[in-house]
């Protein structure tokens, strides 16, 4: 199992599943420059994660790897006897939980199919492979040329006194793509938390300052959005 998983990436951390990148849209240099405008300290990033260095897909920065590039990650692996003490058993089964973060234009159903076919094909003939899909979500990127984005940018600048920089994030909010599919509307995502808030971690927290600033921003957003729609 470990050997099979290792074959899923090459030495440049490029995912080796045939067809995995076929629908990935490469960003222009201008778009990559826009991403680089966002405040980010690699040293602080490494310090927060207690790392001496970072690694990932060659040719991309850490911000790009976490925001615009698809990934394949092993979330857990186990098998055989894992209790206290020792038992000289030969494991008959081994398991791994694997997730893939997708980017716009990729399909979770298609990627699941490609993964299943490839993972099965690289298995030794002496073993059986069972892939059990759990759930998936379509990737989404909010457009920055809509009245909603203009209103959001204005609201953030009014509240915080600085023009916001749009960023792409690898977080999963599957319902956003579903909104567009079912309702035919674009979504805009406003974030008020900080990287240091440790979202989904044991010590997750959210500052009162940003809580109230968020309320203030939402008021400015709806006021500006309403004005823009009336002006059409």
Role assignments for model-derived ranges:
Residues 2, 6, 116-120, 153:
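Generic solvent-exposed, charged/amphipathic alpha-helical segments
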Residues 14-93, 104-114, 122, 126-232:
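An extended, acidic, His-containing surface patch that forms the Zn2+-binding/catalytic region
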Residues 99-103:
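Solvent-exposed residues in well-ordered beta-strands and their adjoining turns
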Residues 1-11, 98, 214-221:
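Alpha-helical metal-binding/catalytic segments enriched in His/Glu/Asp
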